[in-house]
């Protein structure tokens, strides 16, 4: 084998090892984002929910600060139930749904994890659409204990 080939092979191996440390993006967050847009008819960007209150976004602790934050806590709890009782990986579960006139609708033919996770997301998206958005509750994680 030529030294140049060995260098290329070594570079590929090193890059693959480095890439294994990068956590992949959960697949169904794209679906959840689309559901949120469906439910609120595009009135509020999905990014507004990424760091809202004590429960919207990654993790959660303390007491929900308002109705919208309660929607996020309920969604977190629903995902916890999906993991516990359904043995699902909710962040990785891909499901089918459609955007109807009354918001997101899960595919009735699905059962088990797909249906459970879809219902978690659809319920949360509809809850988000109904709840008022208080700008003062954006990026307040330091207040959540």
Swiss-Prot record:
Top-level lineage group: Eukaryota
Cofactor annotation: Ca(2+)
Enzyme Commission numbers on file: 3.1.1.4
Signal peptide, first to last residue: 1-19
Subcellular location as annotated: Secreted
Tissue-level expression: Expressed by the venom gland.
Single GO cellular component term: extracellular region
Top EC class of this enzyme: hydrolase
Note on cofactor: Binds 1 Ca(2+) ion.
Positions in coiled-coil regions: none
Pfam families from the UniProt entry: Phospholip_A2_1
Active-site residue numbers: 75, 121
GO molecular function, a single term: calcium-dependent phospholipase A2 activity
Family, per entry: Belongs to the phospholipase A2 family. Group I subfamily. D49 sub-subfamily.
UniProt protein name: Basic phospholipase A2 S2-22
Organism: Austrelaps superbus
